[in-house]
Swiss-Prot record:
This is Large ribosomal subunit protein eL15. The keyword Ribosomal protein applies. It comes from the Archaea. One of its GO terms (cellular component) is cytosolic large ribosomal subunit. Residues 197-220 are annotated as: Disordered. NCBIfam families: PRK04243.1 (NF003269). Belongs to the eukaryotic ribosomal protein eL15 family. It comes from Desulfurococcus amylolyticus (strain DSM 18924 / JCM 16383 / VKM B-2413 / 1221n) (Desulfurococcus kamchatkensis). GO terms for molecular function: RNA binding; structural constituent of ribosome. One of its GO terms (biological process) is cytoplasmic translation. HAMAP family: Ribosomal_eL15.
Length: 220
């Protein structure tokens, strides 16, 4: 069976030959000097953009967004406390960098809606994503049966309500194997531990779970 052009583009990005790595390195030098949100004429990864719903017609816009890597930069407090309680290290946002990039693109272009996004490149300090934006008021979008669902009022501001692909992944709504690593699962497990007075610093010296269970039986 013959393979399409998009297959070979995807294979080139997957293997990343020396020529492609040199091209990406040269592009990163230019991208660092640009603003954090830049509108593009065409997508960098055509195969990925097409797979996520992009079409080369009026109403579709591609935006490249630069996001800083790592967790939150918390200011170190001046007042005295234990280093453990400084609240400087170990604080990471619950949102993924990809979702943050989508929200920044939506704020830059408030009249457009986010369709999807994909990863492009990264260095030691930044990550670059390309976001596919759609004009929900354009006739070419409203008359397209593939994407006219985004013109409906319930999809307004969908990126800020966690309705994009990155937002659903952050909320733990993926229906597949390996959901034990989601934010919701970890929160649920931590909630059970706190109910049982386990591994919770505020309950040092508290009774063991079996003692609590015995007391509940006596009260009944």
């Amino acid at each position: 069976m013959s393979k399409s052009m998009y297959h070979y583009i995807a294979e080139a990005w997957k293997e990343k030959s020396r020529e492609l790595e040199a091209l990406i390195r040269q592009r990163l030098i230019e991208w660092r000097r640009e603003p954090s949100v830049v509108r593009l004429e065409k997508p960098t990864r055509l195969d990925k953009a097409r797979a996520l719903g992009y079409k080369a017609k009026v109403g579709f816009i591609i935006v490249r967004v630069r996001v800083r890597k790592g967790g939150q930069r918390k200011p170190r407090p001046d007042s005295g406390r234990r280093p453990k309680r400084m609240g400087v290290y170990g604080y990471a946002p619950a949102k993924s960098l990809r979702l943050i990039a989508e929200e920044r693109a939506a704020r830059k272009f408030p009249g457009l809606e986010v369709l999807n996004s994909y990863y492009v490149a990264e260095d030691g300090r930044y990550k670059w994503y390309e976001v596919i934006l759609v004009d929900p008021h354009h006739p070419s979008i409203c008359n397209d049966p593939d994407v006219n669902w985004i013109c409906e009022p319930q999809n307004r501001g969908r990126v800020f309500r966690g309705l994009t692909s990155a937002g659903k992944k952050m909320r733990g709504l993926r229906k597949s194997r390996g959901l034990r690593g989601t934010v919701y699962y970890k929160w649920k497990r931590k909630l059970k531990e706190r109910e049982l007075k386990k591994r919770h610093e505020a309950s040092r010296g508290a009774r063991d779970p079996w003692q609590i269970a015995e007391k509940l039986k006596e009260e009944k």
